[in-house]
């Protein structure tokens, strides 16, 4: 019985000691519970380096602040945290013997736009034996974003954007449960001088060199004969040998003076189209063109359309005209047409075309030579008067000789 009483007394004594120690520990851990309704424990890097000995209500409230000094952005790194401590601890806290390493990694924006990585500030905080130390049993988040607004400088090109974010890596053994300040959105701004300038390039077109147009002659002159050909693949389609002259008049009057322009074969380019029933010959020269259209019937072909265009520079005047549904230089299929005499065609009231020394053929060529020649009727009209004049002259000469002879015979006889 005395042993049981002594054991009970020892038990009560130990319980009293335990309760006494627990009350002292709670008094030390939570000196003023009335101020813990909304506790805010914030510590800068400088405050974390040494143990916290002050009560929670006197803890300074600090945030991540940015200061502008001499045009550069400098950051005073601060981690603002809120530690819920409304629930009193019922367990016995023992001082940690191994040091707890808190690594706070911050990045600072460099003042210039460079491609180098931002400097990293790493702070190692020693162990704290204060009763208000953060519990090391909470797993940290991957990272938290800084609460202060940061300015991101955009540079042209593919460059990394330096962000003014406070990143807490996984090596940090504490968790920031709630931030005391709301996060502000990051507003990127373009740094002056880094954006690509828009160049308003004004291209001034070089003035085109004006080529002087054809000049007109007041009097007609001899026309050069040119040879113009149009090929259908490797076969000859149109072949023309002729001289062309354009005659212009400024007024629709017979008494209006005429001016003349001769087409130079050396400065003329021939082109055209070939068909089974219709082909055309286009002659391009400086200041204008002449177009001839050939039409083929069952047994003959002819020029069915003639058009011309001429631009004169001094004074600047345009003369143009076209004649449809004409029958000009008609001849048999497979033959060539020849006309030495001048042929004129009125295309408009101010433009007239004249050809001379013409020999041409379209369709049905044998080799590259002209076929049988069919001459124009105007050439015959020139020859016949000449032949008639020659015949009349010969007749007159014969009659004169006969008359003279009669006189001689009559003068040789006398009457007896």
UniProtKB/Swiss-Prot annotation:
Keywords: Adaptive immunity, Cytoplasmic vesicle, Disulfide bond, Endosome, Glycoprotein, Host-virus interaction, Immunity, Lysosome, Membrane, Signal, Transmembrane, Transmembrane helix. Residues 143-160, 188-208 have a biased composition (Low complexity). Residues 1-27 form the signal peptide. Induction: By UPR transcription factor ATF4 signaling. (Microbial infection) Upon Salmonella typhimurium infection, at both transcriptional and translational levels. The chain crosses the membrane at residues 382-402. Gene3D superfamilies: 2.40.160.110. Monomer. Interacts with FURIN. Residues 403-416 are cytoplasmic. GO terms for cellular component: alveolar lamellar body membrane; cell surface; early endosome; early endosome membrane; intracellular membrane-bounded organelle; late endosome membrane; lysosomal membrane; perinuclear region of cytoplasm. Disulfide bonds join 237-274, 339-376. PANTHER family: LYSOSOME-ASSOCIATED MEMBRANE GLYCOPROTEIN, LYSOSOME-ASSOCIATED MEMBRANE GLYCOPROTEIN 3. Detected in tonsil interdigitating dendritic cells, in spleen, lymph node, Peyer's patches in the small instestine, in thymus medulla and in B-cells (at protein level). Expressed in lymphoid organs and dendritic cells. Expressed in lung. Up-regulated in carcinomas of the esophagus, colon, rectum, ureter, stomach, breast, fallopian tube, thyroid and parotid tissues. The lineage of its organism: Eukaryota, Metazoa, Chordata, Craniata, Vertebrata. This is Lysosome-associated membrane glycoprotein 3. The keyword Glycoprotein applies. Lysosomal membrane glycoprotein which plays a role in the unfolded protein response (UPR) that contributes to protein degradation and cell survival during proteasomal dysfunction. Plays a role in the process of fusion of the lysosome with the autophagosome, thereby modulating the autophagic process. Promotes hepatocellular lipogenesis through activation of the PI3K/Akt pathway. May also play a role in dendritic cell function and in adaptive immunity. (Microbial infection) Plays a positive role in post-entry steps of influenza A virus replication, either virus uncoating, cytosolic transport, or nuclear import of viral components, and promotes nuclear accumulation of influenza nucleoprotein/NP at early stages of viral infection. Residues 28-381 are lumenal. Glycans are attached at residues 112, 158, 164, 200, 232, 266, 291. Its main location: other. GO terms for biological process: adaptive immune response; establishment of protein localization to organelle; negative regulation of proteasomal protein catabolic process; positive regulation of gene expression; regulation of autophagy; regulation of viral life cycle; response to interferon-alpha. It is a single-pass type I membrane protein. It is found in: Cell surface; Lysosome membrane; Cytoplasmic vesicle membrane; Early endosome membrane. It comes from the Eukaryota. Residues 136-167, 179-219 are annotated as: Disordered. Pfam families: Lamp2-like_luminal. Belongs to the LAMP family.
């Amino acid at each position: 019985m005395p042993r049981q009483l002594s054991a009970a007394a020892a038990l009560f004594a130990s319980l009293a000691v335990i309760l006494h120690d627990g009350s002292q520990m709670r008094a030390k851990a939570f000196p003023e519970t009335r101020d813990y309704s909304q506790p805010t424990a914030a510590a800068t890097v400088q405050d974390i380096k040494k143990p916290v000995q002050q009560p929670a209500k006197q803890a300074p409230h600090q945030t991540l602040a940015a200061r502008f000094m001499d045009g550069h952005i400098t950051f005073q790194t601060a981690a603002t945290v809120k530690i819920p401590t409304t629930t009193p601890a019922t367990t016995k806290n023992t001082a940690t013997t191994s040091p707890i390493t808190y690594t706070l990694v911050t990045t600072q924006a460099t003042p210039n736009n460079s491609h180098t990585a931002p400097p990293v500030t790493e702070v190692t905080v020693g162990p704290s034996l204060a009763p208000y130390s953060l519990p090391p049993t909470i797993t940290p988040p991957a990272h938290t974003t800084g609460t202060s607004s940061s300015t991101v400088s955009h540079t042209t090109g593919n460059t990394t954007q330096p962000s003014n974010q406070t990143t807490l890596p996984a090596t940090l053994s504490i968790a920031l449960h709630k931030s005391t300040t709301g996060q502000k959105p990051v507003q990127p701004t373009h740094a002056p001088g880094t954006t690509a300038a828009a160049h308003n390039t004004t291209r001034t077109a070089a003035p085109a060199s004006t080529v002087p147009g054809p000049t007109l002659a007041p009097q007609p002159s001899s026309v050069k004969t040119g040879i113009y050909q149009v090929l259908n693949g490797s076969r000859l389609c149109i072949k023309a040998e002729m001289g062309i002259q354009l005659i212009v008049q400024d007024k629709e009057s017979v008494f209006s003076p005429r001016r003349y322009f001769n087409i130079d074969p050396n400065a003329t380019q021939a082109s055209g189209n070939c068909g089974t029933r219709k082909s055309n010959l286009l002659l391009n020269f400086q200041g204008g063109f002449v177009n001839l259209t050939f039409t083929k019937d069952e047994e003959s072909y002819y020029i069915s359309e003639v058009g011309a265009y001429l631009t004169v520079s001094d004074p600047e005047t345009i003369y143009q005209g076209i004649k449809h549904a004409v029958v000009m230089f008609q001849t048999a299929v497979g033959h060539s047409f020849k006309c030495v005499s001048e042929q004129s065609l009125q295309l408009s009231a101010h433009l007239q075309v004249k050809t001379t020394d013409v020999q041409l053929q379209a369709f049905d060529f044998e080799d590259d030579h002209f076929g049988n020649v069919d001459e124009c009727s105007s050439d015959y009209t020139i020859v016949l008067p000449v032949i008639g004049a020659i015949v009349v002259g010969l007749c007159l000469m014969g009659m004169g000789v006969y008359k003279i002879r009669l006189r001689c015979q009559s003068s040789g006889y006398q009457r007896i």
